[in-house]
């Protein structure tokens, strides 16, 4: 099954110092991973924020190199925010959108978020 990556697993895969880097790398083996504009933008937002403090061009290059080397598939963010199951709270709206998007494309959202109780979400062990 193809798996749309949530932002946190994407960050963990690319940052060796991330708390869950080894967990993400071990999980990643033999998986078909997928990105979308939301996860790519989320990655750039996290990497240019205070936790990693990368310059915008450096964050874009890190993501670009990953895409070039790993060749994840890509899907457009082609569902409306109002399509699919409604989020239980505003703080979960992006997570639920990504899970709805994954489900609409016949895949699951791969996440570290154990609190995401959406039928199209799969927690990374």
Residue ranges and their predicted role:
Residues 10, 115-116:
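Catalytic metal-binding/acid-base residues of hydrolase active sites
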Residues 1-35, 50-61:
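Short, well-structured N-terminal submotif of metal-dependent ribonuclease cores
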Residues 5, 35-38, 77, 111-112:
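A conserved hydrophobic position in a structured secondary element of the catalytic/binding core
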Residues 69-115:
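Active-site neighborhoods of divalent-metal-dependent phosphate/nucleic-acid chemistry enzymes
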């Amino acid at each position: 099954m193809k798996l749309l990556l949530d932002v946190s697993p994407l960050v963990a895969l690319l940052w060796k110092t991330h708390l869950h880097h080894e967990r993400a790398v071990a999980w990643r083996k033999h998986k078909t991973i997928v990105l979308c504009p939301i996860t790519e933008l989320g990655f750039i937002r996290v990497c240019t924020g205070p936790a990693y403090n990368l310059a915008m061009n450096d964050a874009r290059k890190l993501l670009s190199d990953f895409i070039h080397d790993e060749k994840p598939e890509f899907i457009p963010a082609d569902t409306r925010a109002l399509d699919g199951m409604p989020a239980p709270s505003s703080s979960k709206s992006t997570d639920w959108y990504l899970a709805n998007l994954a489900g609409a494309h016949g895949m699951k959202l791969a996440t570290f978020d154990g609190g995401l109780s959406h039928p199209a979400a799969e927690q990374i062990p």
